[in-house]
Design a protein with these regions (language model features):
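Hydrophobic h-region of N-terminal signal peptides that target proteins for export
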Residues: 10-18
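Flexible, glycine-rich linker and terminal segments associated
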Residues: 19-42, 213-215, 232-311, 317, ...
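Residue-level detector of the transmembrane beta-barrel scaffold of outer-membrane proteins
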Residues: 73-75, 86, 96-98, 126, ...
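Gram-negative and organellar
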Residues: 271-275, 374-379, 383-388, 394-397, ...
Length: 707
């Protein structure tokens, strides 16, 4: 009876508590919904519109807006009387860059259009600098930018502009007011409405000075209306198509693709990457040799190769273990570290007090990890976090293997003697007098390895299947190079035979200690040159800088066969001649890596291949995806003239991880480079695998604990 009475008394309390719990739960979900709505309001943005030449704007006029860093685009526009190809890259949140190629339809190029080049064309580079963006935390202020259109080369469409764009998120509307000088003359404006995220209607006031601009196409000068109206549609948040009126005379269309290559994790998930190691440790009863074999198998499963293992007595029944490991799969140092930490934490028995793991790449001991067993156990048990473990056990400069008199050599594996690689090859040639674009396709077959573990060798041959370059001239008709032709005769090598031995060289590298590295190389370094080279580099662990010294003696290869020549081509006012030549190039290299923005710089000072002296400036940014976009500009004392202006070698480069297109991780990188002109000033011969590039990419960490 008493129990029933107590239950009846407790029932109201339980009921009230339950109702209170439900109220709190409902309030929690309500608060979470409010937070979600606030986040959506903060992150909501209007769709981006792109001009015919590839810059964020409307149809012909740029706006002040720009996407986040890492977004790349490629497009084509038919804007009568022009056909425009464009390539855009958002290097930083506040810097948009665009390269475009405009074809004057119906206007024959006046110098060599009749030779096959066809219609006149112009290359241009444009940039926009964002001074104030809505994403900077000023949602009620307009975006404000200034920009330069076609600021390099012949500058046929050159303009400077300033623009302010206000976004009315609540109404899905944006409005722009801008002013420009050059081809854009005076004030302009734009208005866009996006009733749906995939469709935008827009109108603009076109301020281009079509009538009086000197480089304007004759068929593009007539203007009936300066109001251009049209629409842009986005498909799958990837493709953009646009239709709009132009000058009140024509209808222009464009199509482009835009993708965030900077942050992508790849087209496929890395389903074939093994999980981090979590297996029972080797016990005390196993012999040391069995331990080494277990480690070799475990490292292999994780994507590493174990090449050496030494055991050194430390006293009191404890030993230290020294390992040499080669990373064959992963492209970021923190991934390598995490997997090695897990493997050692689960595999090392309690009879070993310390473990040293040296990581080697391309025959160079790059750095090492030093772990105490007590720290590995604490990490395994979740007492130490990744960040804490990095503080306790940071990277160190690589050490040499222990003495055989003091240590037991448990395991040794030789590097592979021969690895074959088959790849397709595409060579492109732009701006030939007989055509705007020419190509040569084929394949390459290469072999590389470490015979007897003494040095590295690389041999590559190429075979041409299809070529459009057999009738191309190797001399610029309008602007022939007046210095020795160290590069401008390169076309002749590809016209020689269907099969060619591109490279065949030996290289040996050493780590001298305390962050000093050196290498020597000899052989056929590239299609055009062979010789001997040496390099020394100071690049300590945890350093943002490095300094290197390099030099090479190279000889010119014959256009046919494997022989060399001591003559090189030179074009003089009296005609073509050949002069004695032995190539000497030497440089002092300064490197700097700015971690907060993943920027890297190189300043190369010395003598280049054409005996010109000067400096080559290089810079690049690596995005979260591993894609790197770089620029270079060379200033030397060579007097190379193009269109009566002194030319300095410059261009862009692009490299990216191959695993962006794979379902497993890979260290391999692919890339290309494009110079503004193929000239001889600021040229250098390839001399083998550079030390800095090998070490930089092996130590590369997208999210370092310390800057």
């Amino acid at each position: 009876m008493k129990t029933l009475r107590e239950s009846l008394l407790l029932f109201p309390l339980i009921l009230c508590a339950d109702l209170s719990y439900q109220d709190r739960a409902e309030k929690l979900f309500h608060d979470l919904e409010v937070v979600r709505e606030i986040d959506q309001a903060i992150n909501k943005q209007l769709p981006y519109l792109f001009t015919d030449f590839g810059m964020v704007g409307y149809f012909t006029m740029p706006s002040a807006r720009m996407p986040k860093a890492g977004r790349f685009g490629f497009g084509f526009a038919k804007a009568p009387p022009y056909d425009i190809w464009s390539l855009s890259a958002q290097l930083f949140d506040h810097l948009e860059t665009v390269g475009s190629y405009s074809i004057y339809r119906g206007i024959l190029e006046w110098n060599f259009g009749h030779l096959g080049f066809g219609d006149d064309a112009d290359r241009s580079a444009s940039a926009k600098l964002g001074l104030l963006r809505r994403e900077d935390g000023f949602p009620y202020l307009p975006n404000f930018s200034l920009g330069w259109i076609d600021f390099l080369g012949s500058k046929r469409f050159n303009s400077f502009f300033v623009a302010a764009t206000q976004e009315f998120i609540w109404a899905d509307v944006e409005a722009t007011l801008g002013w420009g000088c050059g081809r854009i003359k005076g004030f302009y404006g734009g208005l866009a409405w996006s009733p749906w995220n995939w469709l935008t209607f827009a109108a603009e006031y076109d301020a281009n000075n079509y009538k009086k601009h000197s480089w304007e196409h004759p068929l593009g000068r007539k203007v009936r209306s300066r109001i251009n109206v049209g629409a842009q549609a986005r498909l799958w948040n990837l493709f953009t198509v646009s239709v709009h009126s132009l000058r009140g005379e024509k209808v222009a269309t464009s199509a482009s693709i835009h993708y965030d290559l900077g942050k992508t994790e790849g087209l496929f998930p890395k389903v074939y990457d093994p999980p981090v190691y979590q297996t029972e440790p080797a016990g005390r009863l196993r012999t040391h040799e069995e331990l080494a074999q277990e480690l070799a198998v475990a490292f292999k499963e994780q994507g590493f190769d174990l090449y050496s293992a030494y055991l050194t007595p430390q006293g009191k029944g404890l030993d230290s273990l020294w390992l040499k490991v080669i990373n064959v799969r992963y492209r970021e140092e923190d991934t390598v570290r995490t997997r090695i930490e897990h493997l050692l934490a689960y595999q090392i028995p309690d009879t070993i007090s310390h473990v040293t793991a040296v990581v080697e790449a391309d025959g160079v001991p790059v750095h090492e990890y030093r772990f105490r067993l007590v720290d590995l156990m604490r990490y395994r048990n979740g007492i130490l976090s990744n960040a804490e473990f990095q503080v306790i056990a940071p990277l160190h400069n690589a050490s040499s293997s222990p003495s055989s008199y003091e240590s037991a050599h448990l395991y040794q594996r030789r590097r592979p003697i021969c690895i074959f690689t088959f790849r397709p090859r595409l060579l492109t040639f732009f701006g030939s007098s007989t055509g705007k674009f020419k190509a040569q396709t084929g394949f390459t077959l290469s072999a590389e390895g470490y015979p007897f573990d003494l040095c590295y060798y690389f041999i590559q041959g190429s075979f041409t299947l299809f070529s459009q370059i057999q009738n191309l001239r190797s001399v610029d008709i309008l602007n022939p190079s007046r210095i020795i032709n160290v590069r401008t005769d390169g076309l002749l090598y590809h016209q020689a035979h269907s099969f060619h031995l591109d490279q065949a060289y030996l290289q040996r590298s050493w780590h001298l200690g305390q962050g000093w590295f050196t290498r020597i190389a000899a052989g056929y370094f590239e299609t055009a040159y062979g010789g001997v080279a040496a390099e020394t580099l100071l690049y300590p662990v945890h350093s943002h800088w490095a300094i290197g010294f390099e030099g090479a003696v190279v000889w010119k290869r014959n256009y046919y066969g494997l022989g060399f020549t001591n003559k090189i081509r030179k074009i003089t006012p009296n005609g073509l001649t050949h002069v004695p030549f032995t190539g000497f190039q030497y440089f002092v290299d300064f490197y700097y890596d700015y971690k907060p923005l993943n920027l890297d710089f190189r300043f190369r000072v010395g003598q280049f291949l054409a005996r010109d002296k000067g400096i080559r400036l290089e810079g690049g940014r690596t995005f979260l995806s591993g894609l790197r976009l770089g620029l270079w500009w060379t200033f030397t004392n060579a007097k190379d003239m193009i269109n009566n202006h002194r030319y300095y070698d410059k261009g862009i480069s692009l490299t990216m991880p191959l695993d962006l297109f794979m379902n497993q991780s890979s260290r391999t990188r692919i890339g290309t480079s494009l110079a503004a002109w193929l000239r001889d000033c600021g040229a250098r011969a390839y001399t083998g695998k550079e030390l800095y590039q090998t070490i930089f990419w092996e130590r590369y960490n997208q999210h370092p604990l310390f800057y």
